[in-house]
Regions:
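Generic beta-strand/beta-sheet core signal
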Residues: 170, 223, 255, 432-434, ...
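Short, internal active-site loops enriched in acidic
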Residues: 172-177, 226-229, 433-437, 469-471
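Short glycine-aspartate micro-motif
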Residues: 92-96, 164-168, 221, 241-245, ...
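Gly/Ser/Thr-rich active-site cleft segment
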Residues: 160-218, 224, 237-238, 248, ...
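Glycine-rich phosphate-binding loop and adjoining helix at the ATP-binding site
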Residues: 123-143, 147, 175-234, 238-242, ...
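ATP-binding/phosphotransfer module of carbohydrate and carboxylate kinases, centering on a glycine-rich
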Residues: 2-165, 236, 293-485
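Short, glycine-/Ser/Thr-/acidic-enriched flexible segments
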Residues: 249, 259, 283, 322, ...
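Short beta-strand scaffold segments in enzyme catalytic cores
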Residues: 102-107, 228-232, 243-244, 250-256
């Protein structure tokens, strides 16, 4: 979480003059303390608020399972109904495509006794022009990367005659899944605008590209990263029932009984269970929102959507803090008479920045001062730095506690259908994502909310565990447990 040094102000050249800092004069001299007090009041998450969020999450889940479009939560069927058992043997691969890089992973499985014998992975950067090119160009590039990865094995691994290598495909874009190994791309996100893929089966696109490369590989499982995390964690621990990713974005999935999913219309899996991807970022019921949240949402590319994600995930926490500080600067002269225009730049203050400020234990909060100056171009004394840390803590506390309430909502929904099968025994929630992994205060607030909602005794049965990079291995394991051979 290093913070790069940036100049103090945006420089704007004037004709015939040297560039000089552009400043904005504060609008009034209102005291800053009432702004903080009001913010803390609006962001407060006492037990009744947490309970409402958990109850509403469970109700929205139930409505989303009843019928497609029944609630804000899509409750997407993963078609994963065969879970890794530990008996899987052989060589399996995973391909993780979710951003500007893709990752290839090879996993050698040795069955019950040896489990995961070896893993190797490689990361490849996708050239920017391919993010705006054709479907064939993108998938050919990915297949070429897979072929190069396989070539480096140098004949070390041999498959029985007539068998193809099997791959689990983690595809973190909106997909309408139609089976364990097929899914129709709904739309590209995350800066991709590839032509010729929307409405097509992404597994077919990859399989065809691998054939063009002469690669003896085929996709056995298509999963999103949250489902992969659950499968990867469950391989080691049968008590894993829920997986949550808290990173730039957020999602949660869980193990559900197929007989309580009305929209399945009687289709049952062989195991009687499946993994449901909640798509909980779209949840919005009863959240404690502020003017800063509403303004940020209105200015976003998807106003009115993904409200839970905008309140709890790493993409947005730093931006909410920036908006609060800007108001304090303009209305209360927090940083003196003038305001740096850099502070008016959306998303210039990132969640790693506010995390680094909250880790500063020095007497004069030197790191806080340095980050404020380097990132937003403002100077600060100790009292200002303390105020800034209070703002960070207020936003992060709300985010962590709401995420905890969301987890309890999922557990409540599961408990309603399976009395004492969740709260009556050890239940593990597998967590992954940079926000959860790297922000200790966020982690603490999340766990405190879970304990408050469940009570001390019941919360002892709920284990919240970090499952680092579980989605890649999870995809390979799902390829193994759904092997075509």
């Amino acid at each position: 979480m290093s913070v790069s040094a940036v100049g103090s102000f945006w420089l704007s050249p004037s004709p015939g003059k040297l560039p000089r800092p552009r400043m904005v004069v504060r609008s009034s001299a209102v005291s800053v303390a009432p702004i903080l007090t009001h913010l803390q009041k609006q962001c407060a998450t006492p037990l009744p608020v947490l309970r409402h969020v958990a109850d509403a999450m469970a109700a929205d889940m139930r409505a989303g399972l009843a019928v497609d479009g029944g609630s804000d939560l899509k409750m997407i069927l993963s078609y994963v109904d065969t879970f890794p058992t530990g008996n899987e043997k052989g060589l399996f691969y995973a391909l993780d495509l979710g951003g500007t890089n893709f990752r290839v992973l090879r996993v050698q499985l040795g069955g019950k006794d040896e489990r995961v014998i070896a893993t190797e992975f490689e990361q490849v950067t996708i050239p920017q022009e391919l993010m705006f090119g054709t479907s064939e160009e993108l998938f050919d590039f990915i297949a070429c990367g897979l072929a190069n990865f396989a070539k480096k094995e140098g004949g070390k691994f041999h498959l029985p005659s007539g068998r193809k290598r099997e791959i689990g495909f983690t595809f973190s874009f909106p997909v309408k899944q139609t089976s364990i190994d097929s899914g129709i791309l709904m739309k590209w996100t995350k800066g991709f605008a590839v032509s010729g893929t929307a409405g097509r089966d992404v597994v077919a696109c990859l399989n065809e590209a691998m054939e063009r490369q002469g690669l003896d590989m085929q996709v056995s499982a298509l999963v999103n990263d949250t489902v992969g995390t659950l499968a990867g964690a469950r391989y080691w621990d049968d008590d894993v029932m829920v997986a949550v990713i808290l990173g730039t974005g957020t999602n949660a999935c869980y193990v559900e009984r197929t007989d309580v999913i009305p929209k399945l219309q009687g289709q049952m899996s062989s195991s009687g269970r499946t993994i449901i991807s909640t798509e909980w970022g779209a949840f919005s019921n009863g959240l404690p929102l502020t003017e800063f949240d509403r303004d940020m949402d209105a200015a976003s590319i998807n106003p009115g959507e993904q409200i839970f994600e905008k309140t709890i995930s790493g993409m947005y926490l730093g931006e909410i803090v920036r908006r609060v500080l800007l108001k304090m600067a303009e209305a209360g002269a927090l940083f003196g008479e003038y305001v740096s225009e850099k502070l008016s730049t959306p998303f210039i203050l990132r969640t790693p920045d506010i995390c680094a400020m909250q880790q500063d234990n020095s007497d004069h909060l030197d790191a806080v001062g340095a980050i404020l100056y380097d990132v937003t171009g403002v100077k600060s004394d100790l009292s200002v730095r303390k105020m800034v840390v209070e703002v960070c803590d207020t936003i992060v506390k709300r985010g962590g506690r709401l995420a905890g309430a969301g987890i309890v909502g999922i557990l409540q929904k599961m408990e309603e259908d399976s009395k004492d099968l969740i709260f009556g025994k050890r239940t593990v929630v597998a967590m992954d994502g940079g926000l959860y992994e790297n922000y200790p205060q966020y982690r603490r607030y999340l766990k405190e909310a879970v304990t408050e909602l469940l009570g001390l005794e019941m919360s002892k049965n709920v284990v919240i565990e970090h499952s680092k990079d579980g989605s890649g291995i999870g995809a390979a394991l799902l390829a193994a447990s759904n092997s075509k051979y």
